[in-house]
Amino acid sequence: KSISIEIFGLGYVGFPLTVRLASAGFQVTGIDVNQERIQRLENNKLMDSEIHLEKEYIDCRQKNNIKLESKPSNSTIPKVGIICVPTPIPTKNISSDIFVKSAVESFLNCSKPGDVIILESSIEVGTTEIISNIIKNRGFEVGKNFGVCFCPERIDPSNKEWGIENIPRVIYCSDNSSFDIAKGIYLHVNGGNLLKVNSPKIAEIVKSFENAFR
């Protein structure tokens, strides 16, 4: 699999995704700014809610399919950054997309033409466009030499019937090439069960509606 994947945020969304993609044979770097979390994972210490992934995780580590870092690195092969960081409730001093923007900026520090960002974090309507503008300000042409996708996570921790491996996903991509890359990744997540939409706001509204429904 001739791409490198960096997953930002190793919480209840990013960690299972890291393990699933590494098990499929991808080279995955799990990135988290929480040094304690990185250290615990280096020592194979998982949270109680992750124990069911322990054997699979350790197998992936032994095969060197998972690296753990606090920041991204340069790569000579095409790179995909999947953003799974938390989105806090906004306050007067903190916007809900502060961690998303920080992760994107971090990824862009080591990016090159041909790379792709996939947003999975819960974001407000209009955020994908904001992220696209951040990328453009770095000199990239979104949809031409740099891809942006929004494929909102749909994990419901209490739901035993529907999980990361079988729940359908909605996805927006800036261009067909990025969609092909994303589909190749999610083929190993949920069998590629993706509903493609032609506007980021549609995907954002779908996610907002689901959050409100829950």
Protein language model regions, located:
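Structural/interface elements that position substrates and couple domains in central-metabolism enzymes
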Residues: 1-214
